[in-house]
């Protein structure tokens, strides 16, 4: 019964749908396998997670359990997160050269909608779920306001160069309102659809498929922004990060950049 109330509680929160689903699955899994939410069972569950999953996954599960403990007024039983070892380089980030190459190929081959998908992701720093929220009206306005997980408003800016070219494309297509990126059935395209299509383009144009996925372009936005305007506090705001510490990862080199520097510098 408490879990059903918890579901209703989450439904009224500002959490993403996938997060709510994940929280409910975790709490149900615990209840079925461990029963009562007491200290002994909670520590046993944490031990199971640590033994079988990566730290990031462990912390996601613990976050769900802690949210439920908060809900049933048992905050004192909250579990501590496990430490995640931070890598000293960024992995699988598309290079600026490959991003420009992909854009040029898509434009040349008349794949205009996908040309704009890639450009919007990289010029706005949008998460793919946020990209899907963009409407014609937002392009005309130059920005989109969204509510973040913490209930704050985050503004996603659409740069002038992108905005001007996108408006021309919209007018040529005769689109006057509604979501910008649609599938062949006239429905809003899905995150999975975008990811699959990007993999297809990577294969088609001879790019490393590990580098061509939606979030890679968000990483490229952050790297390019700091290269041109070194204000990490502003970047944190633009990306919707709760903490500036999350944004600091973009001060690091990518693995390929590190390799290039080592190859150039180390000659002994």
Q: What annotation goes with each model-predicted range?
A:
Residues 1-268:
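Conserved catalytic core of the tyrosine transesterase superfamily
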């Amino acid at each position: 019964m408490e879990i059903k109330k918890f579901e209703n509680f989450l439904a009224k929160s500002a959490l993403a749908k996938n997060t709510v689903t994940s929280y409910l699955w975790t709490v149900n899994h615990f209840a079925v396998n461990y029963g009562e939410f007491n200290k002994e069972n909670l520590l046993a569950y944490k031990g199971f997670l640590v033994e079988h999953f990566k730290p990031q996954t462990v912390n996601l599960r613990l976050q769900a359990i802690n949210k439920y403990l908060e809900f049933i007024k048992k905050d004192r039983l909250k579990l501590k997160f496990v430490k995640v070892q931070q890598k000293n380089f960024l992995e699988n980030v598309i290079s600026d050269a490959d991003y420009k190459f992909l854009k040029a190929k898509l434009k040349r081959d008349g794949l205009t909608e996908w040309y704009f998908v890639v450009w919007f992701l990289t010029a706005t720093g949008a998460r793919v779920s946020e990209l899907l929220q963009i409407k014609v009206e937002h392009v005309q306005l130059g920005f989109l306001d969204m509510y973040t997980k913490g209930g704050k408003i985050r503004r996603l800016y659409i740069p002038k160069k992108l905005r001007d070219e996108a408006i021309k494309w919209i007018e040529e297509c005769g689109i006057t309102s509604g979501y910008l990126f649609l599938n062949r059935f006239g429905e809003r395209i899905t995150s999975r659809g975008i990811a699959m299509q990007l993999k297809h383009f990577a294969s088609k144009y001879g790019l490393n498929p590990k580098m061509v996925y939606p979030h890679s372009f968000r990483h490229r936005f952050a790297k390019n922004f700091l290269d041109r305007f070194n204000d990490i506090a502003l970047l944190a705001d633009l990306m919707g990060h709760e903490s500036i510490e999350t944004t600091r990862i973009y001060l690091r080199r990518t693995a390929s950049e590190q390799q290039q520097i080592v190859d150039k510098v180390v000659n002994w």
